[in-house]
Each structure stands twice: as C-alpha cells, then as structure tokens.
Amino acid sequence: MNSSNIKSSNDGCGISTAEDFIAFTYLINGEAYADRCLEEFGTSVNEKMTYYLLNDIHFTPEECARLQSIGHYNQSGFENSGFIDCLDGQNHTLYELKLEPKSNMDSYALFSFVDTAGIIKDLNIENVSYSNAGYTCKYEAILTGRNNGTITGCHIKGNNSFTGESVKQAGGIAGINKGCVINCSAENIDFQLPKAQASGISFSNFGQLLNCYMASCDFTNTLSSGGICYTMEPRSEMKNCYTYKTIGYPSKKKYGSLVYKSNNCTIESGLYCDVDVRGVYDTYQTTPKQIYTYDENTMTAENDIPVIDILNNWISDNAQLYPEKIFYQWIKGDIPPIILELR
C-alpha cells in the first residue's frame, strides 16, 4: 500500500472522527477521498508509518456503509495489496460498526488483508454487527480476514453478532492467521451461521496464537466450532490461552472449548471451564500439554491453583523464548474475571 509523502514528525496527527476513519480506509487503499491525505493521520516511527486513533468513535449505519475494507488479497498472487503499516488504536474503541462484504472476495473484515509487515495494536471494537447478504468469501472475520502480520492488544467487546447464510468459515479476530495474534480477546459474539464453522479468535491458524482469551461467545447455530481456534495447521502454535463460559455449543457438541481440530501443531497452556465438552475436540499428530479445566466460580484449576497464576507464570517461564514479543499481563476483571493489561 502506498504510504509515501507522510510527515515524519509527531505533530498530533491521527484519526479523530468517523469521517476521518472513512477517509483513511480509502486513502490507505490507494484511492482518493475528497481533498484528504494520509499525512493527516500518521507519522513515521522508527522508519515505519504509524497511524493513530485519537478518540473513541461511534459509527452510524450510513457511515458504516461508506467504509472500505482495508487491503485486498488475490489467491493468484497478482494485485495483492495488504496493510503494511501500523495502526495504533491507543486503547480507543470503534463502536457500532456494521460490516458487510459488497462483492465476492478471498477474505473480508475491517482489515481484509494485513501483510507480513503490518501491525494492528491496542484497538477495541464494541457492539459490532457482521452480516453477509450472499457473497462468497473464503475467510470472514470482524478485525482481519487474512493476517500475515501482527495483531496485538486488540479486543472485541460488548454485544456482537455474526450472521450470514453464505458464510462458511468465520473468526472473531482473524479468519486465517499466518502471522501472530497475541494479547487479544473476543467476547460475546453470537454466531448465527447455520452453514459455517466458527471460532472466537482465529478460524484457521498457520502461525502463532499467544496469550489470548475467548469469553461468553455463542456457537449454538454453527455446524462445529472452536473457542480459540477452529483448525490448527501443521507447525502452528497456540499457547497460554483460556476460554470462559461458552454460551452455547453446536449440535452433538461438535465443539472444542480451545480448539476444534489440530494437525501436527503445538498446543500448550490452555484453560477452559466448559467441563461437558473437550478442550481439543480432534487431535492428529498433536499432543496438547498443560491443558487444565477450572472452576468458573472459584477461578481455580487443579490443586486449587488460581487460573491467573497459571497464565502469568507461563509468561514468566516462557517469554524469553519470544524476545521480539511483548506479553501483556493477566489481571483480575469483572466479567470475564481475568483480562489482559499492558504493564
């Protein structure tokens, strides 16, 4: 994506309004938008363009209809245009987004394609409505359809819905992840997808899912689902994740509270309280380790060890294996009772 001619000094640039965000989605895709320019929204930080969200933003349905999905992926490899910069949400929230694909495409979300160098950090999305009127998309999600980059500190909160008769593969944070999703969460997503499989964090994972959680999502009206991830592909990782109180399962309990299907991957340090289903529904050439069930009332696992201690102790013991990553700490919350915070 074209991010040339951007100021390199930090002069208060950023995205403040819904109109700003709409303009940003056009400009970052290389399209003109009135007399606006990308230099209004970003600065160069360590030779990388960073765009800032300066406020919480509430969207109207009319404003949502004018948004462009950021990035485009073509399976042929031609005309790919992924997000390669950094969007720093600064812990602000986008409210009342309505996401709807407008054509057949490989992947669709707020960011359809985040490429290898791309970063989305510290962004909250609350009360989002995702619907598909009949278009064919291979991967669909709320935040990023196809992630090859880094998603960190991003959270889906509030009351959220995901609907569409044509949807086949759906995720909360990502549709397919080939990069790293770390320190992220998905809460209260009602997946009304009778012909689809779904997951709270990432539908398909070829990369890393680290230090994430899913809370109170409803998968009742799906074919089969996984709380954190639907399918873990060969050599992928899911580590130090937990799920809290799944609202409903697909028929015949075709549900893994952490993962639905795993194939020659690493699953380590996972906790769940849905005791009437499996943590990992189906394993192939995979031996999950340090998988715990816990009591949702006391938030303790085996031998009365607090869940929060298991999660934070894993970081203390293993963060040095990921020197380029920043792990947010687990702290006590309300609902869900354990959340993430950068300290």
Regions found by a protein language model. Name each.
Residues 1-343:
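Surface-exposed repetitive/solenoidal architectures
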